[in-house]
């Protein structure tokens, strides 16, 4: 399990079409083989007690599909566990991998996915999106280059949640200049506190 990794996203020039304008951005290939991107991302997954069954299913399902899955816990059921540490560790691992040039994405699960998304987003360089349908899952990647997806395990069937996760993992970032620019503005505020118009 990856924990305690450095929290230091890359930097770039705001407003340029350079991929470095969005710290932590790793180009997502559009080429596909057997339905998967040519470069399949490493997947970091975390949950709390409310998402444990879904998490176990996803680890097995994604591993069988050829993804390298890193499980950030918990390892056993505890109805009183707290999700922040699990989700923060998954977020830290995604950012560290991306900084090292490894194509990585994250999944955080809970009852609603809301708290897990909030916790993951406290990690500098994480762009966590709550997905509740196929459109939000795909747009999170296509427009926002989200690197973590949050899903509510109590809001969907296992089949529905799996479909959302797969849509997120397989959707490429558009690389459109306007989206890179907007992501860059968020990153500037995150790292400097400056609001760029």
Regions found by a protein language model. Name each.
Residues 2-10, 14:
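Extreme N-terminal basic, low-complexity initiation segments
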Residues 39-43:
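Extreme N-terminal starter segment of soluble prokaryotic enzymes
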Residues 44-64:
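Glycine-rich phosphate/diphosphate-binding loop of Rossmann-like nucleotide-binding domains
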Residues 46-53, 134-197:
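C-terminal binding/interaction regions
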Residues 60-69, 125:
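Short helix-loop-beta junction
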Residues 68-80:
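A short beta-strand-loop structural module common to alpha/beta enzyme folds
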Residues 86-130:
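Helix-adjacent hinge/juxtasegments
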